[in-house]
From Swiss-Prot:
Gene label: ERDJ2A
Annotated ranges, domain SEC63: 205-603
Keyword check for DNA damage: no
Summary of the function given for this chain in its UniProt record: Required for integral membrane and secreted preprotein translocation across the endoplasmic reticulum membrane.
Regions of this protein lying in the Lumenal compartment: 1-8, 87-190
Keyword Protein biosynthesis attached: no
Tissue: Expressed in leaves, flower buds and flowers.
Protein known as: DnaJ protein ERDJ2A
Compositionally biased spans, kind Acidic residues: 623-654
Residues bearing carbohydrate: 90
Residue spans crossing the bilayer: 9-29, 66-86, 191-211
Length: 687
């Protein structure tokens, strides 16, 4: 029984050890991550963003940010750890090793006179005749007397010095660090131990696995339902106009789960009257169009109206119940739009290409939702393909302000950005009638807006020229600069109630055939991850081309410096198409800012497949053909559409207006082509 009690006393130590093995490293990782967080402000500092409250770190927010499940679990485990440490430290002395020298307060090897002197001193303190305390009596009999006997008896002392115990050599004893009730073989401990093992080691993990799998089976890795991806895949069309993307977007299964209450009917009717002009309804048959709109699934109607409330900035009139649904719709929007974009660029054609037109529409819808700008504001105005939408994302700007500054020949958003600070301040105060504080807010937002440049190349590694069927390596450096010097930052989005990171989508596409050859998402917030990815990609590319160690290290070092300077590397592989010249466009589309997209022309010449022995050479006829095609290429460049305009002003009958649209694009694009001549020349150098 004593042995079982001793083993039971070891059970807290066993639990303490098992808990400390994962808990201590995990705590160190959490603390290092918390201490390494940058304190630099990366969000907008204008008054509108400040009033939104999403960046304010109040006491409640600090507590809520700390009170996550992982942090609370961590604190609870440390409380248990501290309790076990205290309990272990104050365990019964019966579990301690018998050491007569330490009991008498002596050092090993002392003389008999010192032993007797120590015994007399302790007897005065603990002897029953001197101290009536029962605990003192017990300690004197069980420890002090035995220790004195072990050290004064010659045989006992010799055994202690040789074997560490007064009784001589002791047998080796092993036990199980389990509670005593589980080691009581006379009772029902066998069944309890069996139930404990089965419950903790088998049933508990099984129940957790079943619950996790039953919930996760409905979702993908991006926490989007499989049903949503299926709907997006089948509803996506190659000719889907940006104005029609909303109809596909609202078909998400997550939005179908938002409850539709009878009390929502009247508020939704009022909201419908406020946003009716943004719903693409036919004005000639308004009654029929309204009836058709309300015949849709109630969840779809509710979702679309709530999104329109965000686009038109009418969320303030929503009832408290609809406010919760409104926040839920916007909370799901970023990841649903990302998956919708992936469904647009997923390989559809025989050549493995996606569709450009719906992809651009998804990005434009994302921009409008984040900036709370109506889709109708994106209608091209002749000078700007984005309409007045870039102006409306600035604080204190409205349609009236845009009309006022347009009288001073500020026709496009680029004109406003390129003005000198003094001229812009004078324009906004004297012409637009804004206050000095309003102008200061506008300047803060303009300093936050990114400027993107793209340097892209396509080549076959280790070969001269690209031949049909080759595996082509695409390499693009996307560089971001802001007037305030930040690289990674959160956008100005005072009407979007959640934190939204800037994401950029790099699309290599053929605007004429509506094909997307390559797509990849780029983020500028994670510099460490970008350095790791760029180093790995450059290293593999250099090693594949047969470069030496020094050349590889130099290339990796150069790539790291570029990443630290605000660039991100985009690399991918694609198969070369049939022989011909392809006028491609590299789109770099931002999903948060309007008017910050970048389009870079890229001309790719694919040569005819030659015999196996001459793969790396360009034939003389090919060189002559290239020289002869230069004049023809110059003519083609004049007609090349380098600016993929927004198409929210199109009607449903798109096929009938296609020829007129192409003609208007050529007319409006002639002036822009001169501005992009440098990019065309850089594209021709990649031939």
């Amino acid at each position: 029984m004593a042995a079982s009690e001793e083993n039971s006393a070891l059970f807290p130590i066993f639990i303490l050890t098992i808990m400390a093995i994962p808990l201590v490293p995990y705590t160190m990782v959490k603390l290092s991550g918390a201490l390494s967080k940058k304190q630099r402000t990366i969000h907008c500092q204008c008054l509108e963003c400040d009033r939104s409250g999403k960046y304010k770190r109040s006491l409640f927010k600090k507590i809520s940010n700390f009170s996550t499940w992982s942090n609370l679990t961590l604190v609870l485990l440390w409380v248990v750890m501290i309790f076990l440490i205290y309990y272990t430290k104050n365990m019964s002395r019966e579990a301690q090793v018998f050491d007569p020298f330490s009991i008498l307060g002596l050092e090993p090897g002392v003389t008999d006179s010192e032993i007797k002197k120590a015994y007399r001193r302790l007897s005065i303190q603990y002897h029953p005749d001197k101290n009536p305390d029962p605990e003192a009596n017990k300690y004197f009999v069980e420890f002090i007397s035995k220790a004195y006997q072990a050290l004064t008896d010659s045989v006992s002392r010799e055994n202690f010095e040789k074997y560490g115990h007064p009784d001589g050599r002791q047998g080796f004893q092993m036990g199980i660090a389990l509670p005593q009730f589980l080691l009581d073989i006379d009772g029902a401990s066998g069944g309890i131990l069996l139930l404990w093992i089965v419950g903790v080691c088998i049933l508990l993990p099984l129940v957790i696995a079943v619950i996790y799998l039953s919930r996760s089976s409905k979702y993908t890795g991006n926490y989007v339902m499989h049903q949503t991806l299926s709907a997006y895949y089948y509803l996506m069309k190659p000719s889907l106009a940006p104005s029609k993307v909303m109809e596909v977007f609202t078909k998400a299964a997550e939005y179908m789960e938002i409850p539709v209450r009878r009390t929502d009917d009247e508020p939704l009717q009022k909201l419908f009257m406020s946003v009716r002009s943004e719903l693409n309804l036919d004005l000639k048959n308004m009654k029929q169009e309204q009836a058709k709109f309300w015949k849709q699934h109630p969840a779809i109607v509710k979702t679309e109206l709530l999104i329109q409330a965000q686009l038109t900035r009418e969320s303030g009139v929503l009832s408290p119940a609809l406010q919760g649904d409104f926040r839920r719709v916007l909370e799901l929007a970023p990841r649903l739009l990302e998956e919708l974009l992936k469904m647009a660029v997923i390989p559809r054609t025989a050549q493995g290409h996606g569709w450009l037109r719906p992809a651009v529409g998804v990005v434009e819808l994302s921009q409008c939702i984040v900036q709370a700008v109506p889709l109708s504001a994106r209608k091209s105005s002749g000078v700007s393909s984005e309409g007045i939408s870039p102006f409306l994302q600035l604080p204190h700007f409205s349609d009236a302000v845009v009309k006022k500054i347009a009288r001073k020949k500020v026709k496009s958003f680029q004109d406003l950005q390129e003005m000198r600070l003094e001229d812009r301040s004078e324009l906004l105060t004297q012409v637009a009638g804004l206050s000095a504080t309003d102008v200061e807010d506008i300047e803060k937002v303009l300093e936050m807006m990114p400027s993107i440049t793209v340097d892209i190349t396509c080549e076959t590694e280790g070969e001269e020229g690209i031949q049909e069927g080759d595996i082509v390596t695409l390499q693009a450096w996307v560089t971001l600069k802001r007037p305030n010097g930040l690289v990674g930052a959160l956008p100005h989005a005072p009407y979007f109630p959640f934190h939204k990171e800037e994401n950029y989508w790099v699309l290599l596409a053929d605007s004429v055939s509506n094909n997307v050859w390559f797509s990849q998402k780029v983020s500028f917030l994670d510099e460490g991850g970008a350095i790791t990815a760029a180093s790995k990609a450059i290293s593999e590319s250099m090693e594949g081309s047969g470069a030496g160690v020094k050349e590889t290290n130099d290339a990796v070092r150069e790539a790291i410096e570029k990443v630290k300077g605000g660039s991100r590397l985009v690399m991918g592989k694609l198969q070369a198409p049939a022989e011909g010249t392809y006028n491609l466009t590299c789109f770099c589309l931002c999903d948060t800012w309007i008017g910050c997209d970048k389009k870079q022309a890229l001309k790719v010449k694919v040569l005819k497949r030659t015999r196996a022995g001459t793969r790396g050479l360009v034939s003389d006829e090919g060189a002559i053909a290239e020289e002869g095609m230069e004049e023809e290429d110059e003519i083609e460049e004049e007609d090349y559409d380098d600016d993929y305009e927004s198409e929210y002003s199109e009607d449903e009958d798109e096929k009938k207006d296609m020829d007129e649209k192409r003609g208007s694009k050529k007319a409006n694009g002639s002036v822009k082509q001169k501005k992009e001549s440098s990019s065309e020349e850089s594209g021709s150098e990649e031939e």
